[in-house]
Amino acid sequence: MDATRELATRRRGRRLKPMDPAAFRTSLDTAKPPKVSAPLRALWHAAKGDWNRAHEIVQDEDGPEAAWVHAYLHRVEGDLSNAGYWYRRAAKPVAKGELQEEWAAIVETLLVD
């Protein structure tokens, strides 16, 4: 695991447990998000319908993973020009497909990489 990923998977000085995409989806049935990186927590809140909380979590985060989630959130909001800015920051192409498909692709990438 590279240093950037290592930092992204730490919380309060403890290494986070790995989680697979299916377990992440199952966690949506719980009241609190799992102990995952900030970008993944933002996606968790977004899936639960709390766009504002998701945006609060990711807006002050650095790095391409956070930028990708930030782009997705602005796409959900319908602010495509702002989303485009964040896709560029993430070095990702602007998504054109269904929002649910993009959410799943981001989750898969962030949990597997």
Please annotate each region the language model reported:
Residues 62, 78-97:
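TPR/TPR-like (Sel1-like) alpha-helical repeat modules
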Residues 27-32, 55-64, 91-95:
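Solenoid-like repeat scaffolds
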